[in-house]
């Protein structure tokens, strides 16, 4: 690699590449979430018959992973570059390897391995066949072919490619700590994110109000159900995301027992499943607008039989 791309140049390069492959460039969704998969641009769009090709950066918060900014590779918040293609292209792995070349990583000159790692997200009732992508011994990407999302079988199958941007940038820039990554010319990652890393870690582990969080979870759960009763999928899913983040804060604080933990996850999963079913039903009412006319006519005729 001759030129060491900055963090933002890595993002720009991936955006341009996947735009050229036919992906819409979405923006980060404005609710806390633990992974790019939980964005409605993946979770909702992976279900139902309509095609969907999108790419976006997603800041992902995992309160239990915070380390006060003292760990060089473990973060309260990291950034994922998410690519979702439905139906999955037959050459998705080749497309991915070509994206690495755009970043200056020649697959012929490096040890790139696809290590089987089937994926599951119990809190959203989602699972799929998956692989971790290892670059010279370091995981940089997760590949998943969704089989189930929100408890619904996916058809057509959606392919998801999730780049870990901090890990990728650490490799490209040859630094040992994420805080030494050059975000932009003359600006280090740590100069932007070290302070919030420390503060969010302190809040998550020491300061959060457990009673308030428990109360909020109950309120968010009820509001999600209330929105679903009116067929309001997106407001309901926003509250599912709020439930998930609130649970993650409670978990980081040690406020839930092992038994309670399973119960909270089941409550979030049940809501997510209703959201998924309602989303498909509402898209059907709209006539699945992203389908081509011929496919739409056939599908709606079959459903009407």
Curated annotation (Swiss-Prot):
Keywords, in A-Z order: Aminoacyl-tRNA synthetase, ATP-binding, Cytoplasm, Ligase, Nucleotide-binding, Protein biosynthesis
EC number: 6.1.1.14
Keyword Disulfide bond: no
Gene3D superfamilies associated with the record: Bira Bifunctional Protein, Domain 2, Class II aaRS and biotin synthetases, domain 2
Record family assignment: Belongs to the class-II aminoacyl-tRNA synthetase family.
Quaternary structure (record): Tetramer of two alpha and two beta subunits.
Protein name (Swiss-Prot/TrEMBL): Glycine--tRNA ligase alpha subunit
């Amino acid at each position: 690699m001759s030129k060491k791309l900055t963090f933002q140049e890595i993002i720009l390069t991936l955006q341009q590449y996947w735009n050229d492959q036919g992906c819409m460039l979405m923006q980060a969704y404005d609710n806390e979430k633990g992974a790019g998969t939980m964005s409605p641009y993946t979770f909702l769009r992976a279900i139902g018959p309509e095609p969907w090709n999108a790419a976006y950066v997603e800041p992902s918060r995992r309160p239990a992973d915070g380390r006060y900014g003292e760990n060089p590779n473990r973060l309260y918040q990291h950034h994922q570059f998410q690519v979702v293609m439905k139906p999955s292209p037959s050459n998705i792995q080749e497309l991915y390897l070509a994206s690495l070349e755009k970043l200056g990583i020649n697959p012929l000159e490096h040890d790139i391995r696809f290590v089987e790692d089937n994926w599951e997200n119990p809190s959203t009732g989602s699972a799929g066949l998956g692989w971790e992508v290892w670059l010279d011994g370091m995981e940089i990407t997760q590949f998943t072919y969704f089989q189930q999302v929100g408890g619904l079988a996916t058809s057509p199958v959606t392919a998801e490619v999730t780049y870990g941007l901090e890990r990728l940038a650490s490799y490209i820039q040859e630094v040992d700590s994420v805080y030494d990554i050059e975000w932009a010319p003359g600006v280090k990652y740590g100069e932007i994110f070290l302070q919030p890393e420390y503060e969010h870690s302190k809040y998550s582990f020491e300061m959060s109000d457990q009673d308030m969080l428990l109360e909020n979870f109950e309120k968010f759960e009820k509001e999600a159900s209330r929105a679903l009763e009116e067929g309001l999928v997106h407001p309901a899913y926003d509250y599912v995301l709020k439930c998930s983040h609130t649970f993650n804060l409670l978990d980081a604080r040690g406020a839930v027992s092992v038994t309670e933990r399973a119960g909270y996850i089941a409550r979030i999963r049940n809501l997510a499943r209703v959201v998924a079913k309602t989303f498909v039903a509402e898209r059907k009412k709209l006539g699945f607008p992203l389908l081509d006319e011929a496919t739409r006519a056939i599908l709606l005729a079959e459903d009407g039989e």
